[in-house]
């Protein structure tokens, strides 16, 4: 009986020690409000005053939203969803739209808050998405929105390390 109790106690101590050894605090990079503002303002300036710009943090929370003069009301939601799509899949929303147009990946289009439209770009440090930007309402369409989003990110590229 004492042997069994000793074995059980020893095994419990071993499990507890191995569990706590693997537990540690995570260190994650995220987009700051200052960086989000610079990206959004640059994208708006590069594009047209009629666009809406949404910048999200790594968790998909809205950090900055700019609605240009004369922007349509629905562009707010479109910009946010484009940014969310880019963040979630760590690729431009236009690239994701192409990848999910046919085949096994089409089911991804039914996920909440994603949208198969161009204009969303992830903000990356290496392979890690720390945020994203989405634009909607550019007169040149989705390719212009993506170019403006990339210009916003380029403004802070030296800080993305």
Functional labels for PLM-detected ranges:
Residues 6-18:
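Bacterial N-terminal signal peptides
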Residues 1-3:
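N-terminal secretory signal peptides that target proteins for export/translocation
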Residues 21-161:
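Flexible, solvent-exposed loop/hinge segments and secondary-structure transition points
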């Amino acid at each position: 009986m004492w042997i069994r109790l000793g074995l059980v106690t020893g095994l419990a101590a071993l499990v507890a020690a191995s569990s706590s050894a693997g537990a540690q605090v995570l260190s994650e990079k995220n987009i700051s409000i200052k960086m989000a503002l610079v990206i959004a303002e640059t994208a708006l300036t590069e594009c047209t005053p009629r666009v809406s710009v949404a910048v999200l943090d790594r968790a998909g929370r809205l950090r900055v939203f700019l609605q240009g003069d004369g922007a349509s009301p629905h562009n707010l939601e479109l910009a946010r969803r484009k940014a969310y799509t880019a963040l979630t899949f760590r690729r431009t929303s236009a690239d994701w739209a192409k990848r999910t147009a046919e085949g096994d990946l089409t089911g991804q289009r039914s996920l909440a808050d994603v949208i198969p439209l161009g204009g969303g770009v992830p903000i990356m440090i290496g392979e890690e998405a720390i945020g994203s930007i989405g634009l909607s309402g550019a007169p040149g369409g989705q390719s212009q929105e993506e170019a403006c989003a990339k210009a916003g990110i380029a403004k802070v590229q030296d800080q993305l390390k």
